[in-house]
């Protein structure tokens, strides 16, 4: 599929950025907003935001959306079933003889033996305890231990969830509308054939993991704190961040969630923007790619309250994320690569990096002292992993003192909490739950624009010039 520009569906229905009045410069509004944000994070608020199991406020909200579950490459036709932990539920995933994916509660509905032990063969998964067999929709198709005149397989169903696949990603819908699920969201990065997807498990709650993506002021310290402006070429995408490590922000509500624009004036007087998004219920778009030519999306999928799985999806018409592939002026790479542990078969055995809490994430104090890395940790992803996991399995929000540069975090928490409680109280959901094109209003990245232009003007001008990708008809199991 060749790149195509996304065409708006008309002013009345196009995804929008909420028009918020600009406040005059000065510390008072930001400080007041941050004080209010800290007060708002009461114990019940924190619980409602972070807990994701069945029956929880956030867990039930997330179940109304399609959820990335696995890479398509992880499941082979008639291959080994895979344990899958999602939203606190222990599931089993498999691909049948026809290539369709099934995702079930791992317990056989007969006597609760785990279907992970089962035989994936001849268009279904068979429990090894008594031989009961189920197709990908959870229908019992064989009950061989029961005499034919007594069998009741038409009345037995495994707890199966709807699945679909698109461009290398397996999706699952865990909500109530199993017979009529909502449309698959048009997350632009997932619309690009041949996109790049990688996964990484994080041993902490999903919220603190996600918030690292929408906290742009940490970049000047955690990731490039060791650099001076003269270390980078004049056109290096990270140079404005190194020159000015304390950006100003504009934050907006959007139909898809929230967005921020972090801005700094560069050497020639232009405004350097870094724009990023939060998209309901657990997606981010980070500002590290080129806005005009590359789409990126990152899903922070809760496995349970203490573990999350990152699905990083990107694609475009350039060479990739400049923050990862770029070098210093002297030709030395900015970051090292990280290594994975071999995947195992336990509930938390997939996509773990080698450097984790057990070895202080590979911290090298000499590297920290001599300026090789500000953190002493050589990989940019593991730098993020270290600080978010070091907060504990679930951050104790009562300890926090949010700063003016945390506006995006405070706004996103508020949006999430209000949306999840609105669904609990009235069944109301944000637009993206039913309108898949809502998410097409979001594109992240860095760009230069004329000084003094408001965020909306700069963003819309760049969006109109950007290469876009559109959806193809989806397929569902």
Question: Language model features by range: what are they?
Answer:
Residues 34, 39-40, 54, 100, ...:
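C-terminal catalytic domain of Rieske-type non-heme iron oxygenases
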Residues 34-121, 151-179:
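N-terminal pre-ligand scaffold of iron-sulfur
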Residues 63-77, 139-147, 277-284:
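Short Pro/Gly-enriched beta-strand edge/turn motifs at strand-loop
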Residues 93, 120, 132-134, 162-163, ...:
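A structural signal for short hydrophobic beta-strand segments in well-ordered beta-sheet cores
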Residues 106-109, 125-128, 141:
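Cys/His/Pro-rich metal-binding microdomains
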Residues 143-158, 293-294:
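Short acidic (Asp/Glu) patches
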